[in-house]
Amino acid sequence: AVAPSNRSWLGVARELTAGTALLPTNTIPQEARSFAPEDTPRFLPDEAIRGSLALRYGNVLGPEDATFSFGGPAFLDTYGFLLDNIFGDLSTVGSSPANGTSLNGALAVGGTVAVLTGGTTTTYPNGGTVQIDSGGVSEVVILSQAWTGGTIAFTGDPLRFAHANGATVTTVTSPFTHTFAMLNSALGYGGITGSQPPTHTLTDNTNLNFAGSPGTNTSGARAYPFACVSQFDLTLNSEQLVSARFQGNSFLSLPATAAPTNTVSTSLPVAAWQASVYIGGTAAGNQVTTIGELAISVKRKLQVIWTLQGNANPAVIARGDLDITGTLNFTDPTDETPLSYMLNNTQPLVYVVLDNGLTGASHLKVTFRCSQASFTKAKPERGQMLMAFANQWESIATSADTGGSGGLGPGVFTLLNSTPTY
């Protein structure tokens, strides 16, 4: 028997408890052979001298974790899982609100039950899509229990924000607009102290099994729990598809608990020429049409921490500072404006919009906003035919680039698609 590599696939699921592996809920299409998970146990050498001229007398299994990287054309319906992982502050607004009611009592971060002032089993059924609150703290949940005596439950979507008594509640439909910002609240995902975003299980479906002990695998897949993204790179080249790449750390892999289901995205990648770039002024003004390529890089510091706990896996993979940088290649400049961004240190807004131009369930749109971008490089280049500038910028954290958790942030992504929750 053989296992063709093109029949392998990558699955993702948001974990309800950090480090507890789940079967994938969605498949993330990727470039062939780009998914590179690797278990990285440390081996502790015994090199104590004992009367011989050998160097090593044993390797003792030490602490364990894993790394991963993958990428390819950007699929704007599934990559929200990874944006949520690296940013942590996620608010969502649905469309066509109906069956309006309100909360009968305040809700805390991490809650999975709400009491409503109105509603019925018909208007709030099991599996229904419900929006709680509005503005920066709006969130969408999928009901795991129909309205019963005024109570709804959503065990798969613990609340990310606190909600006041009387906050609005409605049923909603697609499309959904998701806003990703840096999490700054004291309570992180699931109501755990420490401003930590959610973790995910990445599943590598290899179609390879193993019969033996320990580690028998009959699922044909390996799960990488507690996956934390350390870097996300988005690249737009005017002659290519929009591409994205992710990398990070996770716990050591283990056999998936069952054969996973391949839930493939039906969306298509987007050509980069469909993007619009704005520099300075407001988000809707100052369009710049001389940029041939741009890149946005989001980096999150991670620290893998092991403790004396009788387990070789990490105690936690901690998330720290988040930074956003980027490049803008002005391949057709008409003057020295790209140079002036650096020399004058104007630190303008950088705003990118990518819209596939479709409608209904096929409509996909992503925007990125950095309200204060410090241009640190503007190198003149001599292209094949024309003069050009290769610019680099660094984000400056401001109150304009935040979500419902407040504070200061370096930038914000929004996604519009038909995916209700991440």
Sequence positions of predicted segments:
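Signature of extracytoplasmic/envelope-associated structural regions
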Residues: 1-422
